[in-house]
Regions:
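Transmembrane alpha-helices of multi-pass small-molecule transport proteins
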Residues: 32-82, 109-110, 161-169, 184-203, ...
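Hydrophobic/aromatic residues within transmembrane alpha-helices
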Residues: 30, 40, 44, 90, ...
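Juxtamembrane helix-entry segments on the extracytoplasmic side of multipass membrane proteins
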Residues: 5-9, 34-42, 65-70, 142-165, ...
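Specific transmembrane alpha-helical segments of multi-pass solute transporters/efflux pumps
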Residues: 19, 24, 53-103, 139, ...
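Glycine-/small-residue-enriched transmembrane alpha-helix faces in small-molecule transporters
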Residues: 1-39, 43, 86, 145-172, ...
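C-terminal transmembrane-helix exit sites in multi-pass transporters
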Residues: 51-57, 87, 106-131, 253-273
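Helix-helix packing/entry segments at the starts of transmembrane helices
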Residues: 11, 42-43, 99-105, 170-192, ...
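Hydrophobic transmembrane alpha-helices of multi-pass small-molecule transport proteins
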Residues: 52, 122-142, 195, 249, ...
Length: 298
């Protein structure tokens, strides 16, 4: 890997991390503008899916899968729908910064499952990552100012659980040969269909109305979904999934910074300390690994 390739690849992953870090703040700005959760998710995934599939067809990226891969793709899609749904439910109770921190306990969960099942050997650094993640989560949960928001923390934790299913599905042998952009296209499409049904059942409008709402939907779909995924795929090809995962560790940090400056999120001492523990755990978890696959932002 030459220095130019490394710099460009790293910049792509940094761009992805910034895009993902903006998701909570832009989502809350959308809520303030009067966009319902169901409408937001449908618009975000629908427009991103249109762009992604246009890219797939223009670039002639292979997207057909055999029966085995198609079944695993269904598991991955359902898991990701769970990620987006539970994360946005948590937004009803806690800040986007806090929800992002809690959801980032998923790498420690993956490590724990891999060690318990024998998929990965037991290593001190891996155990340290799990312990740090649990300590960070405990500090966040025990923050005095958020005792009334255990429901939000619970749903953010469910987001992490769904991420585990999603990540392990991506890492399965059946999906190794599939193009990551095609996989992202299916994930976005299935999420759009699911939230279209949610809009129909809830009575919420499928499309945002008004200039401000449309701008926020455009930013979430084009920047936080389509561009973020595309940059991630390009970056991974250039610097490898391991290096990409390490850079992506800083997503919850950026989410907190953006939340604080853009929408005025409150950051308590326990939240900051717990967040540092979680970020450290993710960093340790990814340092010796080969990466955890594609992670389209929720």
């Amino acid at each position: 890997m030459n220095s130019r390739t490394k710099i460009i690849g790293s910049m792509c992953i940094i761009g992805t991390t910034v895009c993902y870090g903006l998701i909570p703040s832009l989502s809350f700005l959308s809520f303030d503008a009067g966009v319902a959760t169901e409408t937001l998710l449908f618009n975000k995934f629908f427009y991103a899916a249109v762009l992604m599939w246009a890219y797939i067809f223009i670039k002639k990226i292979p997207f057909r899968m055999d029966a085995g891969a198609a079944k695993m793709m269904l598991v991955i899609s359902v898991s990701y729908i769970g990620v987006a749904t539970t994360l946005y439910i948590s937004f009803n109770y806690i800040s986007g910064s806090l929800a992002t921190i809690v959801s980032f306990t998923f790498p420690a969960m993956v490590i724990a499952i891999e060690m318990i099942t024998g998929m990965e050997p037991v290593r001190i650094m891996k155990i340290a990552a799990v312990i740090l993640s649990l300590l960070g989560l405990a500090l966040i949960v025990w923050t005095p100012d958020i005792k009334g928001n255990i429901t939000g923390i619970f749903f953010a934790f469910l987001t992490a659980v769904c991420y585990v299913g999603y990540i392990m599905g991506l890492a399965s042998k059946r999906m190794k040969k599939e193009n990551s952009i095609a996989v992202a296209g299916y994930v976005l499409l299935s999420s759009a269909v699911f939230n279209c049904i949610r809009c129909a059942l809830s009575g919420e409008p499928m499309f945002a109305a008004g200039k401000v709402q449309i701008i926020y939907m455009f930013l979430l779909a084009v920047i936080c979904a389509f561009t973020a995924i595309l940059l991630y795929c390009i970056g991974v090809r250039m610097i490898g999934p391991g290096n990409a995962a390490i850079i992506n560790t800083f997503e919850p940090v950026l989410a907190c910074i953006f939340g604080y400056f853009i929408i005025g999120d409150v950051l308590t001492r326990n939240m900051i300390t717990g967040g540092i523990f979680v970020v450290a755990a993710v960093f340790i978890a990814n340092l010796p690994s080969k990466g955890i696959g594609l992670k389209p932002g929720a």
